[in-house]
Amino acid sequence: MDLTKYQVFLKTVECGSFTAAAQQLSFTQSGVSHAISGLEEELGVTLLSRSRGGVTLTADGWALMPYIQEICRQQRSIEERAKDLQGLETGVVRVAVFTSVSVQWMPYILKSFREQYPNIEFELLPSNYNTEIARWIQDGTADCGFLVLPTEANLDCWLLQRDQWKAIVPWDHPLAGREPFPPEALTQYPFILLEEGDDYEIQEVLDTLGVQPNVQYRVQQDQVILAMVSCGLGISIMEELMLDRNEYPVVVCSFAKPFYRNIGICVKDKRAISRSTYRFVEHVRRWVLEKYSG
């Protein structure tokens, strides 16, 4: 079954323009435009609204999008199952992932996974928004994804790791090495606040501690916070996972009462995932268990 038109349509929606979609698909721009026009003619509706700024879905496009995604997902499953029957381990797994996992886990997970399954390919979809990752899994944009649990989305999830929140201070700070770290210090010293992604997680920790920090800087990346703290510009709090293999000269301190976020991996329906996705999810679970069990 030739689903090229559907695949071109989905990639165009993802990229927001014919030009960007053509580059990713190794098509000409006119080829992408022709494929979309042919699909619209075949279906008898206008799927995309064209403008100089790019393309957006029409109301009809929004209505048909889930069905087109499901058709392409089913086609991938058929192709992968056929290859399984031939004794081949191939496929593409699209993984939605947030920063700390993509930096600290994914390179090592992918390396060990591909030693077993060298012909399975990956597409990593970065986002630091739990709701966006959950939506990608639900609508088929991603085959699986890492989420902070619990999630309100109706997904099948497996808990991987409890990630503890820590305070970080410059190496020469008066509170460096102070255990437990006093929460009131967050109000007494300049605080660097991460505003990347779902910053409600940080706010929940601060609310539980009962403090309103002395926010002097608002930044978008964890690595920037580490660099600023190491230079003595302030203090902050950060997930322990992001501090793994940290090379900045900062001191990590624990609160008297530990605070955690739960990291999990999720799929839309564990009974309907592709063989490649199943193998990857199982590999991730084993890898995390082995890493933190000893």
Q: Model-found features: residue ranges?
A:
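Hydrophobic hinge/microswitch elements
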Residues: N130-I133, Q138-T141, V148, G197-V251
